[in-house]
């Protein structure tokens, strides 16, 4: 890493976008990556790149499943989700989005040239529109439908 590090500048610009939009999730995530980049911890980037997404999905899944595990959502509530049309729609959409995410993983693996655009778009969506950073996989899945890959 030299005196002029364009990657660091991009990260700092994205962190500034997170600060301006008052999105602490984006800001903290990017500042964490900046800290890793400028310290000896940077040799962990291959590990973060390889396992970071899986770890993030694990944490997200824990957060989503916590109401069932805690009893806030009862077994009866889960079973009744197959009896109401809104819940059936939620199940169908969950299946569709999971399928799109799977296509997205394949596209991102096979065509790494699209990853930068997906990531920048996701960070912008999170920072500007209060989205959540699950966008790259779904965006890649949608892109795969448009370009016929995945």
From Swiss-Prot:
| Protein name as catalogued | UPF0756 membrane protein Dd1591_2981
Q: Name one GO cellular component term.
A: plasma membrane
Keywords from the UniProt entry: Cell membrane, Membrane, Transmembrane, Transmembrane helix
- UniProt-annotated location(s): Cell membrane
Per the record, the major location class is membrane
**What is the native source organism of this protein?**
Dickeya chrysanthemi (strain Ech1591)
Q: What is the lineage of its organism?
A: Bacteria, Pseudomonadati, Pseudomonadota, Gammaproteobacteria, Enterobacterales
Q: What InterPro entries does the annotation carry?
A: UPF0756_TM
For this chain, the family text in UniProt reads: Belongs to the UPF0756 family.
Q: Where are the transmembrane segments?
A: 10-32, 51-71, 88-108, 127-147
Topological type in the membrane: Multi-pass membrane protein
